[in-house]
C-alpha cells in the first residue's frame, strides 16, 4: 500500500513538472486589456476567426472593459488592440433568469461579481448567481453555463438564454456616423429543440466597409422551450452550447462546430498555442516570462484566417482583419516570419489573392472589405520583407510548403505605385499619387501629405528591392531613384529646438509653408505657425486630415528606415545626428505609443553606437511596459506594440523590408528559438552590468551589431556581452552599402 502511494505521488509530481514546463501558462490575456492597449482578453485560437467574449457596453473595440461592471452579453466576433471606430460584436447571447413578472429583457444586462482569465478561457459570475465559462475553436464558441440550483423551471420563471442577432458594437442613435457600424438585417430560426440558426448583417465600422454577414448555428446539449422570438428556457442548471459561425452560410456555420466537449476543446486550444509559443524557451524572471509570452500571443491573434469563409470568392489562403498593415509591417510581420514562416507565406499569398479579385492589395481590411489606408501602400513592405528573407522562394518554399509568385507580387506592388485609386483612396492604393509622381512629393492640403510622401518613398524602395532580385533592372533603377523623394520635403535650413533640418509642408508651387490653415472653416481662414510639434488641426478634425498621421514632424523627420545614411548626412553628419537623437529622447519627443517611432531607438546603430540603442530600449521598456492590465503604452494594433516588445526583449530588432536584424543587449538572459527549418538559434547574455559591449555569432564578433536573416536561419549562438562600465565606443559604424539594397544577384535565390 505504501509503495502504491509513493508511485502515485511520483506520478503526480512528474505531471506537475510537465504542466509547469508549458509556456502557455505564462500568457496573461489581461495584459493590455485596460488603458490604451485595448487587447481582446477572451479566448482565441492563433489567427482564429471566432473570438467570443463579453460586451460590457457597445463602446469598447474589444467588447470587454473593466468598468462599468455590467455585461450586455457575449458576442462571437471581436478584434484586438484597435483604435478608431468599432467593428464586429455579432451574435450576442446572454444567460438570464426569466420571470413572467419581470419580463425577458429586464435582466438582460447583468452585473459581474468576478472574472477569470487564462489562455483560451474566460469565466464570469453574475450577481444573480449565473456563471458562464467560454472557450473557442477556430470558428466556434463553446459555452458552459451554470444556473443557480434554486432557479429550476416553473411555469412562471426559468433558466433562460437570450439570442440577439441585432447586436453589434458601436451602436449609436445617430445614423451614418463616420466609423460607426449600422444594422442592416438579422434572422433567428428555430430548427428543433436543440438547434437555432440565423444571421446578422451589419455595415460600416472603422473601415467604412460594405455590409458583411455573420451566419451562426447554435447547438444545445439540453432541449429548450421557446419563449418569445429570441428567448429559450431550460429545465436544468447546467447548459453546454456551441455557437458555430461562418461568413458564408448557416450550413457552413454548423459544419464549423467541432464534435467535442468544452474541456476537450479547452485542452486543444492550449495545446495549439503551446505548439507555437514553445518554439521560444526563455530564462528570466516570472515577470519577464509573462510579458514575453503574452507579447507573442498578442502577435498571433490577427490577421484572421478566413480561408474558405470568403463570400466573394473561393481562392485560398484568405486572411481578413488586417488592422492595419500600417501598424503591423514594422515588427508583427517579421516576428510571424521567425515563428511560423509558412503562416507568413500564406498571409502574403492572401494579399495577392485580394489583389487578384479586387484590383489592389489592402493597407487595412476588415469585414471582407479593404480600408482604411493610413499612410503608404505598406503591403509592399510585407512582400519585400518576405522576399529578402527567402520566404516562399526556392528551397525555402519546399521547407515551409508554400510558394509565393513574386513576379505576380511585383505586378501588385506596381499597381499600387502607378495607378491612382481615385475616389477609393481610403480603401486601397495611394491617395495623392498623381501629385506624388508630378512633384516628387505630396503638397500640403492633401490629407496626410507628409506621411504619404515619406512612406511612398519607403514603399518605392521595397519595390526596387524585389525588382532587383527578379532581374527587373529598369524597375529597380526607377524606384530606387524614386525612394529618395523623402528629400523633397526635407527643409534643410529650418531650425527649431536647437536642431536643423525637418520634414516640413510645401505647396504645389514648391514654397515652404511657415504657417498653415487651422481647421477647414469656410467662413474664417485662421492660420497658425507650423512647427515640428504642431498638430495641424483643431480637436474636431482627426489625424486623417492632418499633414502627418499619428505623429508629428519631430518624429517623422527621423523615420527614413530605408535610407538612414542619407538621413544622417541631411542632419549634418554622425556627431550632429547623435546629439539630435539624444535631445529627441531627453526632451520627451519620442512616443513609443505610435508606430512611426518604432525604429528610432535603433538609429544609434548607424553611427556605431549600439550601446546607446541598448540603453534607450531598456529605459523605454522600463518606463512604458509592465505585466499589468494597463501594461501597454498604446493601442496594441494587432500585436504591433507587443511584437516591438518581444523583439527587444530578445536583443534583436528588424528593419522591416530589409534582410537584417539590429542587435543589442537583451532583457532576457538566455533564450532559444526552434527555427522552422529545424535549426536552433540561441541567445545568451554574458557579463555583468547593463552596458552593451559587443555581440558574437558562433564565436565571431559582429562588428556592426547586425545579423543577416540568412545567417540567423543557419542556427547557432548569439552571445551578447555587457559590462558595468561603458567603453568609449562600442561596435563600428554601419558599412555604407549602396542604399542598403541587399546584394542579391539576378534571379539568385537567397
Task: Mark where each language-model region is.
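Bacterial N-terminal signal peptides that target proteins for export
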Residues: 1-10
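N-terminal signal peptide c-region/cleavage motif recognized by signal peptidases
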Residues: 15-18
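Accessory carbohydrate-recognition regions in carbohydrate-active enzymes
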Residues: 22-149, 158-333, 337-381, 387-392, ...
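ATP-dependent phospho-/nucleotidyl transfer catalytic cores
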Residues: 459
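Surface-exposed interfaces of beta-sheet-rich extracellular modules
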Residues: 686-699
